[in-house]
Amino acid sequence: MDNTSKLAPDAGNAKTGIAKWFSLVILLMAQIGTMGDNSGLSVATASLINELGASVSDIAFANAMYPLIAGACMIAGGMLGLIWGWKRLFQVGALLLCLAEIIAAYTDNIQVFIFAARSLSGFGASFLIPAVLGLIVGIYTDTKDRAIAFGAVAAAVGVANTAAPLVFGFLIDKFDYRVAFEALAVYFGIVFVLGFALEKIEKPTVKIKFDFVGTILVSIGLLAVIVGLLKISEWGLISPLSPSSHILGISPALPLVLFGIAVLIIFLKWENQFEIKNGACLMPQSFVKTPQLRDGLYMCGMVFFVLGAYILIGITYCQLVAGYSASDTAILLIVFSTGMLITSLATPTKFAHVSCRKLCMIGIGFCVIAAFAGALGTELDSVNMIFFGSALFTGLGCGIIASQASLIVTAAVNQRDATQSGGVQATSRNIGQTIGIAVLGSVLMFSLTNMVKSDAANSDLISVQTKQQVEQIASIPFLSDKDFTQLIEKNITETKDYPALIDINREARKSSAQLSWLVLAAMCFISIFTLTKNIPNYSLSKKS
C-alpha cells in the first residue's frame, strides 16, 4: 500500500514575515514548556520533602516517572499524530500537561503527585514533543525554512535547560512550589489556546488503524531497557551490589536490559507484518532499513548522550566537590546554553553550504574537546577556568549536532513518514540520555569504588581492621566529604583512620571523574567515524 500522504506542500512558503514564523513561536513555547516541567521538579525537591513529607525514594520515583512514561510512549505518540492530526495531538498534549501541573500544585499527597501529576506529565510530553517535530515537518516544507525551524528548537532546548530551573527556583523562593506549578499550568493553558492558531496539516487520505499490540510491546521493551540501564549503578552490572537485589545470584540490571531488547526485536517483527497488512505502523520499515535515517537518530541520541554525561559528571562534581551554589551552577549552565544557542541558530543560516556529515563530525569533535577540558578542569576540591571551556564546547557541539539531526531524519523518508518520525526522534533522545547516564555513571562509581579500596589496601596510615572493613563495602558512591564521612561512620569502627580515608576518597573522586571525562572523549571520538558514515555529504539546509 502507498505510504505517502497529501500534506499541504506549500504551507511553509505561502506566508512571509511574522505570519510565516508565528506557528514556530508556538511550537518553541511548547518545547520550552516540556523542558521546564522536566527540569523544574529538581528545584522543588526540598519543598516536596518539607510540605508533602516525601522521602528521598519518593523524590527519585517522581523524577523517574516522567522520562519513563514519556520515553515508552513517544513512538505511539508519533502514530497518533497521523490518526488524530498533528494539531489535535499538540493540543491534547498541552491539555494533559496543564492538568498535570494543576494536580501537582494542589495535591497534598505525594503518591498523587507521583502517580497522577508526573504520569500525566509523561503522557502529555509523549504527545506534545512528537507533535512539535511533526508540525515543523508539515508546516515548513522548504528545506531552508525547515533547517531554521529545527535549529530554533535546538536553541530552545539549550535556553530552557538554564532558564527553566532559574524561573522555577525564583517562584519557589519568592512564593512557594505550588505557585511555580500553577504558573506552569497557566503556561500550558496558553499553549493549548495558541494551538488553535497553528497551521493546519492535512491528515493522510487513507484511514489508519492504531497498533495497540505494538504499543504494548514497544512500551514494555523500552521501559525494561531504560530501567535496566539506569539501575546498573545501584544493582551492579554482573555481581549484585545488594544482597536483596539479585536474580539467581547476579544483578537484575543486565537481564532486564536483555529482556527489553528481546521484546523490542519481537516488536520490530510485529511491526513489519502490521505495516504490510494495514499500510501504516508505529515503526515503518523505512525507519529500520534506511541507513541515513538511522544515523540521523544516532545524532538525535548523541546530543542527549553528551548532555546527560555532562550533567552527571560536570554538574555533580561542581555541586558535591567544588561546593557550587544554585547561582554558581546557573552561571556554568549559561555558558553551556550560550554556546548551544549560537551554533544551533548560526549553523543552518551561516553555514548552510557545509555538508551535514562534516557539520556533525565537527559538532562531535567539539564534544571531544569539551570532555578533555572537563578532565583538565577537574581539581581535588574545585574546578578551574578550563572547566568553563568544557561547558562552552559542550554547548557549541550539541548545538551543531542538534541543528542537523532532525533534518537528516526527515530528509531520508517520504513526507508522511517524516512527520511521524517525531516520536522515534524523541525516543532516541531519551535512550541517548539514558545510555550516557548509565555508562558514565557506572564508570564513575565502579572506578571510584575500586580506587578507594585499592588505595586503602596499600596505605600505611590505615589499620588492618579498617582495610578489611573498607573491602566489605559493596559500592562507594560519589559523595561530598560530609556525606562520605557519614558513610564511613556507619561502616568503619576505627575513628583515627577517618582523615586518611577522606583524603583517599578525595584523590579517588578526582581520578574517577577525570577517567569518566576521558571515557566520554573516547566514545565521542569513535562516534565521529562510526555513526556518521550514512549522513549526506552535502547540505540539507539550502533553500529547495
Language model: regions and residue ranges:
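Small-residue-rich alpha-helical segments with characteristic i,i+4
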Residues: 387-473, 532
